[in-house]
Amino acid sequence: MTDCWYIPEAVADRRDENRLSPNVPASYEVLGEVGIFYRHFDPKEVSDDIEGFIQPLLKKLNYQSYDVVNLSPANLGAEKFETLAEQHFMEHIHEDDEVRLILEGQGYFDVRDINDKWIRLLSKPGDCIVVPAGMYHRFTTDQSKDIKTLRIFKEAPRWIALNRGPEAEEKPARKEYLARLHAPAETAVGAANGRTIFSLRYPLKLDVELTAITKRLLEQHSKRPLALAIYLTGSTDPTTGESWCPDCVLAKPHVATRFAELRGKYGEERAIFLQLPVERASYLGNPNFPYRTHPTLQLASVPTLLVLTPAKDAKEKGDVQWHDLLDVKVRTCDADKADVLSLE
């Protein structure tokens, strides 16, 4: 995994790390929220056979062409390099996704979070970054002033930037990006509505947010039973519109069926659905991923479906967290075969 952190609005030297003091780390969940796709490939796998590596990737992403560029004073000349470097660091959007795979050297992508704050994403050999069309961003090399990247395009290679301003704001790509950014999160059972369907993106905030939701639901439905389905699934890959996890794609309709069964048993207002998207870059190869180590979730693989009902003494419990108020009745990686109608 690479590193990402917040930086100030203005920086003295764009090629420094420019961390805040104290450092404020970002996360892949924050990047995912604004549509950034990140994946790391073995740099040797790429550099040993670029053509053999890139052709399957082009097909998967439905892109048509690529080129390789080397940004350095030695390759371009000092004057041309600095001119391009300044252009790349102007805040801008593109009308197509910007797809970059780092081959050699290092650099920084700066992207805006949902509150318009800058996040700096370190980009190293093997890192593949997709910046969605319409998203404000910028790029710089580090102090080495030397980076080699593979660029992927939907059509013929081109790089057209629209600097931040009224003209960029009126572009369809910008308007479509903002519409996606502020749209309700989609889940396996429909759009999140903050009432019976929820999506919580940040693992480190889960307990606080879900405890508040659970207590509110228990108070609202104190005299009638309810059930909470928690679905942990690979987050959506913006390049395909589907989960990065193939098994999660297959599980999605079965999860919807199981939840429909819960609604039939408990009623629409007392069957609650929570989707927990799992970011690939945070999860794979990370034994300390919060959902893995969580005392109740105990995530072993995605997809995983849990169904919980209120603990018998939930009403008597005081200042406790959600997992003290609910009992796990179903835990499965195979939603197709799960029995959610025999809960006691």
Swiss-Prot record:
Key words of the record: Amino-acid biosynthesis, Cytoplasm, Dioxygenase, Iron, Metal-binding, Methionine biosynthesis, Nickel, Nucleus, Oxidoreductase
Catalytic activity: 1,2-dihydroxy-5-(methylsulfanyl)pent-1-en-3-one + O2 = 4-methylsulfanyl-2-oxobutanoate + formate + 2 H(+); 1,2-dihydroxy-5-(methylsulfanyl)pent-1-en-3-one + O2 = 3-(methylsulfanyl)propanoate + CO + formate + 2 H(+)
Gene Ontology MF terms in the entry: acireductone dioxygenase (Ni2+-requiring) activity; acireductone dioxygenase [iron(II)-requiring] activity; iron ion binding; nickel cation binding
The EC number(s) this enzyme carries: 1.13.11.54, 1.13.11.53
InterPro entries: ARD (IPR004313), ARD_euk (IPR027496), RmlC-like_jellyroll (IPR014710), RmlC_Cupin_sf (IPR011051), Thioredoxin-like_sf (IPR036249), TXNDC17_dom (IPR010357)
Gene3D superfamilies: Glutaredoxin, Jelly Rolls
Domain of life the protein comes from: Eukaryota
Keyword Transferase: no
Cofactor binding, per record: Binds either 1 Fe or Ni cation per monomer. Iron-binding promotes an acireductone dioxygenase reaction producing 2-keto-4-methylthiobutyrate, while nickel-binding promotes an acireductone dioxygenase reaction producing 3-(methylsulfanyl)propanoate.
GO cellular component: cytoplasm; nucleus
Metabolic or biological pathway, per its Swiss-Prot or TrEMBL entry: Amino-acid biosynthesis; L-methionine biosynthesis via salvage pathway; L-methionine from S-methyl-5-thio-alpha-D-ribose 1-phosphate: step 5/6
Known cofactor(s): Fe(2+); Ni(2+)
Subcellular location: Cytoplasm; Nucleus
Sites where the protein binds Ni(2+): H92, H94, E98, H137
GO biological process entries: L-methionine salvage from methylthioadenosine
Binding site for Fe(2+): H92, H94, E98, H137
Keyword Cytoplasm: yes
Function of the molecule: Catalyzes 2 different reactions between oxygen and the acireductone 1,2-dihydroxy-3-keto-5-methylthiopentene (DHK-MTPene) depending upon the metal bound in the active site. Fe-containing acireductone dioxygenase (Fe-ARD) produces formate and 2-keto-4-methylthiobutyrate (KMTB), the alpha-ketoacid precursor of methionine in the methionine recycle pathway. Ni-containing acireductone dioxygenase (Ni-ARD) produces methylthiopropionate, carbon monoxide and formate, and does not lie on the methionine recycle pathway.
Family: Belongs to the acireductone dioxygenase (ARD) family.
Protein name, per record: Acireductone dioxygenase
